[in-house]
């Protein structure tokens, strides 16, 4: 084990527990699962992040039926004070960062930078996760990255590999180059070349518009140049400065988070000269966190999965009643859909043929549970949330929306629903880990062939596919027709009339997902394919 490289895993967010609110969504949950898995496997890895005092957003539905955001101040008594502080120069002023350590969620050490100390003029830089304005965002990324590298050195933690989870940690690469030029006397080209040997990079967003770009004037003003020149920074990130292009040019190897995403990412970044090779390492989830122990025992003992699932479903329905004061029926086919509110995820696709969905809902054949948050400054996403909420008013006995989506809601739904619906516009879903969590609990996936599902789906055996991988302008009509066809001809008849087949499919789903889509498999691939040279 001593021969394994020592890894520092940098990420803007970490989802370790619902009460530790330093995460926004899937990126953070992935990062949290990876730290827990490293602990399980005794791998030499540490996490580097930020202690967000206000977290992401507490998003509730107002009286007008629209989501509204609030930002409570959180304090945590379970963190260890390392006694270490470091400085990062931002906008010409030194910002002091305190370093906290978190190990209390069965995870390897996670070091968190915090500017909320009396010595700082701007203690709020580590207030809200994902700053609203470019200046704030760049400052936060500098704290994570430049501050993270300096924190590890101050803590005397040896690092062989720096893993950038998404492009936010890119300034860490610039800091490593600066160090080599200043302390070791290297020229820029040699320092860059040596730095690349230390960095690996995970790219997530398969949509150009979702990849962060900054104006050079802003970066210079903020201090992200960090001793480098405009010419040197342009060689790394181009002009304007693309954070993803920079990640690809700063790393020795990069990965996409699924096989289909790998194809998409290679096409997207084919014109980036000097980019690292992009391989595919499909995401996975932490079994111990997401797979209910009772369903695992029933699966392992070859006992009645139906009975155990019904128990989990009842627990979910009771939680829904406690939150929403609505009694859903335990014997009705229940479909769950919970994820970030983004247009490409098409949470409303199932409502595209109202004459059919109304018959199914009012006829007692179907009930729907939705949950999800929109980015606070994403008006389109907020409209999606409002539209979903409005459907609960149209069908108050059959549709539920659970507000303020978090890890706890995610656990409840991916254990208690009968079917997990996923219908993004292909190929815009890089991975999508909620379906993996559902699959591990015998909740059957009904999904477009996007993200992870093309790798796991055996139609009619462990879940169902929507369509045949169609990509084109007419995707809305094509996919909605396919969704209804599978729902009416296969999903509903199997649930009500072929109960033994349903249980067999549940067993196949658990068998398919429990290792293939586990974070253990993922992390071992990171070591074998990325970390070990």
Task: Describe each PLM feature range.
Residues 1-533:
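Catalytic cores of carbohydrate-active enzymes across secretory and cytosolic contexts
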């Amino acid at each position: 084990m001593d021969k394994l490289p020592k890894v520092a895993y940098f990420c803007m967010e970490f989802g370790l527990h619902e009460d530790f609110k330093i995460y926004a969504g899937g990126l953070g949950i992935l990062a949290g699962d990876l730290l827990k898995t490293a602990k399980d496997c005794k791998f030499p890895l540490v996490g580097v992040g930020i202690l967000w005092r206000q977290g992401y957003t507490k998003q509730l539905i107002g009286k007008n039926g629209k989501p509204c955001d609030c930002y409570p101040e959180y304090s945590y008594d379970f963190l260890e004070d390392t006694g270490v502080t470091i400085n990062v120069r931002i906008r010409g002023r030194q910002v002091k960062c305190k370093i906290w350590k978190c190990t209390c969620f069965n995870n390897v050490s996670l070091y968190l930078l915090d500017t909320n100390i009396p010595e700082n003029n701007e203690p709020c830089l580590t207030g809200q996760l994902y700053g609203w304005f470019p200046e704030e965002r760049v400052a936060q990324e500098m704290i994570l990255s430049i501050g993270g590298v300096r924190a590890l050195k101050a803590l005397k933690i040896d690092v062989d590999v720096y893993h950038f989870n998404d492009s936010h940690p890119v300034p860490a690469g610039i800091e490593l180059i600066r160090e080599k030029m200043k302390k070791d006397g290297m020229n820029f080209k040699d320092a860059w070349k040596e730095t690349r040997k230390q960095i690996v990079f995970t790219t997530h967003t398969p949509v150009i518009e979702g990849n962060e770009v900054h104006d050079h004037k802003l970066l210079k003003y903020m201090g992200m140049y960090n001793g480098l020149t405009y010419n040197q920074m342009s060689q790394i990130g181009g002009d304007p400065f693309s954070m993803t292009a920079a990640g690809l040019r700063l790393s020795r190897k990069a990965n996409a988070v699924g096989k289909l995403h790998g194809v998409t990412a290679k096409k997207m970044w084919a014109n980036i000269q000097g980019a690292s090779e992009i391989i595919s390492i499909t995401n996975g989830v932490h079994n111990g966190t997401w797979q209910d122990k009772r369903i695992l025992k029933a699966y392992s003992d070859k006992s009645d999965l139906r009975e155990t699932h019904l128990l989990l479903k009842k627990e979910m329905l009771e939680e829904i009643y406690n939150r929403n004061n609505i009694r859903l029926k335990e014997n009705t086919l229940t479909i769950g859909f919970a994820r970030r509110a983004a247009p490409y995820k098409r949470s409303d696709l199932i409502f595209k043929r109202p004459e059919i969905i109304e018959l199914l809902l009012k006829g007692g054949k179907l009930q729907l549970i939705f949950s999800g948050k929109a980015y606070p400054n994403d008006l389109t996403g907020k409209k999606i949330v409002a539209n979903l909420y409005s459907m609960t008013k149209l069908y108050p006995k059959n549709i539920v929306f659970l507000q303020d989506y978090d890890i706890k809601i995610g656990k409840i739904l991916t254990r208690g629903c009968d079917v997990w619906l996923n219908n993004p516009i292909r190929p815009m879903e890089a991975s999508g880990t909620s379906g993996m969590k559902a699959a591990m609990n015998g909740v059957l996936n009904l999904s477009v062939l996007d993200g992870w599902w093309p790798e796991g789906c055996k139609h009619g055996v462990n879940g169902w596919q929507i369509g045949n991988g169609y990509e084109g302008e007419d995707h809305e009509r094509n996919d909605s027709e396919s969704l209804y066809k599978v729902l009416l001809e296969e999903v509903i008849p199997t649930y009500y009339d072929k109960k033994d087949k349903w249980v067999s499919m549940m067993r196949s789903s658990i068998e398919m997902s429990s290792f293939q889509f586990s974070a253990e498999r993922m992390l071992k691939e990171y070591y074998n394919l990325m970390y070990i040279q």
